[in-house]
Amino acid sequence: RALTLAVGGIAAISLAVAGILVMNVMLIAVTQRRKEIGLLKAIGATSTDIRRLFFAEAIWLSFAGAVLGFLLGQFGSLLLRLAYPQLPAWAPVWASIAGIIVALITGILASILPASKAARLDAVQALSKK
């Protein structure tokens, strides 16, 4: 029971760090893509459209990270079972599914600030700044 709680705590910390990393990547993307966002707004994209674009990007980043994490975890479990056959190194299906869902939710929540920042950009200012 203590081991389960410890692993759960480590997983929670990992998800918090992952959320912060997704938010930082998205904030950098907003900064680097100011002109692109300005151009989209200049040709008629609404703030909602811009927000949706950044949410979609965050979902894809989070999904890719979740799937990669799942695959690496399965591979690590396999290696552990091969090295120590008597050790039950496997994750229940519900835990794997929950991990992927929580990773997606974390990514979406972490993208709220960057998506809002991108949606608030003014087209003229975004296109004129260097």
Label each PLM-derived region with a short phrase.
Residues 5-23, 27, 34-81, 95-110, ...:
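Transmembrane alpha-helical interface segments in multi-pass membrane proteins
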